[in-house]
UniProtKB/Swiss-Prot annotation:
It is a peripheral membrane protein. It is found in: Plastid, Chloroplast thylakoid membrane. This is Photosystem II reaction center Psb28 protein. GO terms for cellular component: chloroplast thylakoid membrane; photosystem II. Keywords: Chloroplast, Membrane, Photosynthesis, Photosystem II, Plastid, Thylakoid. One of its GO terms (biological process) is photosynthesis.
Amino acid sequence: MATIQFIQGINEEVVPDVRLTRSRDGSTGTATFRFTNPKILDASMADKGEITGMYLMDTEGQIITRDVNAKFINGKPQAIEAVHVIKSPDDWDRFMRFMERYAQDNGLTFTKANS
């Protein structure tokens, strides 16, 4: 099973919008995750700990990014945006294996952008 966590041990229930970019030679890229009203920002989670990163967990292990930011509207947190930088073809392959598992577990589909 593939899950996303912001505090280790607590699975995020909200499924994000994920946008991918990749360099022309395929060696690097970015994955931008946007969670609208994620469970981790709920008042009931305040005593669970601090957000220390985004942890992508699956049967192969975990992928970690520390580039995590909250978006506020009228002083209240409404969304989380996390950016994972993919630095090599091997990292890209590993990330895509995670996303295939996560998509399968959460009913997501992949739509390729028109180029």
